[in-house]
């Protein structure tokens, strides 16, 4: 399968059309951004690492009955995907208080939540991806109540699977972002699952092993991404 026209370029990936109108190729870049594009940089081989991790996790989730956009891994940086009509809702699942949850509500960082929190954000860079509820999403026309219910249920189910998977690899899944899209009357999981979209802390030391190392200039970014990749793929 070959790339044809560039369909979309985002902060971390490019999406290309192919000869099949139902399929696209997602190419992972090394570009890194934070704080809604206010901080920019590069993480060496990030695209290679995130593609490998995402392909592994999508395949694992498929084995648990979660339908995703992954068709196959084409190369180190390229993933063949079903072409989705992306729902403009970012779904964030939080297991441990960190990031904006701490800033917005005053949780102490590291507080283990009694029950995971599921949040919806409007996928709109110009508006800085604002937090929204179901009523906002429906009023904006980005999703129906029925679709939002599916997104919430799917995100909670994915969280159960991912938490167990990462715990077996000595990683705490602090929180993560998911994106979904419509595909022939189905809703599929899209985008990626990687240290760009998840917060991972080492199970024993609570060392941050994700994009927070880039956000807050903690150093060792490439090493952290590589270590997550090693643990995710260690049983392959």
From Swiss-Prot:
Origin: domain of life: Bacteria
Pathway: Purine metabolism; IMP biosynthesis via de novo pathway; 5-amino-1-(5-phospho-D-ribosyl)imidazole-4-carboxamide from 5-amino-1-(5-phospho-D-ribosyl)imidazole-4-carboxylate: step 1/2
GO molecular function, one term: phosphoribosylaminoimidazolesuccinocarboxamide synthase activity
Enzymatic reactions: 5-amino-1-(5-phospho-D-ribosyl)imidazole-4-carboxylate + L-aspartate + ATP = (2S)-2-[5-amino-1-(5-phospho-beta-D-ribosyl)imidazole-4-carboxamido]succinate + ADP + phosphate + 2 H(+)
First-tier enzyme category under EC: ligase
UniProt keyword Signal, yes or no: no
EC number: 6.3.2.6
Family the UniProt entry places it in: Belongs to the SAICAR synthetase family.
The organism of origin for this protein: Chlorobium limicola (strain DSM 245 / NBRC 103803 / 6330)
Name of the gene this protein is made from: purC
Upper taxonomic lineage: Bacteria, Pseudomonadati, Chlorobiota, Chlorobiia, Chlorobiales
UniProt GO BP: 'de novo' IMP biosynthetic process; cobalamin biosynthetic process
SUPFAM superfamilies reported for this sequence: SAICAR synthase-like (SSF56104)
Keywords: ATP-binding, Ligase, Nucleotide-binding, Purine biosynthesis
Keyword Ligase: yes
Full protein name: Phosphoribosylaminoimidazole-succinocarboxamide synthase
Gene3D superfamilies the UniProt entry points to: ATP-grasp fold, B domain (3.30.470.20), Phosphorylase Kinase, domain 1 (3.30.200.20)
């Amino acid at each position: 399968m070959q790339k044809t026209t560039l369909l979309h370029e985002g902060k971390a990936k490019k999406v290309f059309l192919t000869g099949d109108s139902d399929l696209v190729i997602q190419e992972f870049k090394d570009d890194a951004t934070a704080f809604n594009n206010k901080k920019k940089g590069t993480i060496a081989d990030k695209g290679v690492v995130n593609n490998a991790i995402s392909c592994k996790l999508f395949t694992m989730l498929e084995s648990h009955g979660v339908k995703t956009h992954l068709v196959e891994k084409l190369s180190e940086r390229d993933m063949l995907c079903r072409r989705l009509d992306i729902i403009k809702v970012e779904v964030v699942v939080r297991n441990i208080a960190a990031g904006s949850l701490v800033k917005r509500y005053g949780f102490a960082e590291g507080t283990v939540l009694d029950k995971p929190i599921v949040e919806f954000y409007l996928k709109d860079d110009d508006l800085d991806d604002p937090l929204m509820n179901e009523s906002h999403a429906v009023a904006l026309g980005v999703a129906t109540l029925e679709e939002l219910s599916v997104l919430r249920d799917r995100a909670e189910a994915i969280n159960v699977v991912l938490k167990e998977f990462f715990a077996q690899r000595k990683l705490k899944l602090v929180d993560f972002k998911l994106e979904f899209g419509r595909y022939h009357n189905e809703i599929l999981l899209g985008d990626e699952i990687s240290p760009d979209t998840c917060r991972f802390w080492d199970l024993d030391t609570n060392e941050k092993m994700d994009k927070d190392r880039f956000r807050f200039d903690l150093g060792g970014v490439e090493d952290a991404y590589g270590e997550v990749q090693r643990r995710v793929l260690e049983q392959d």
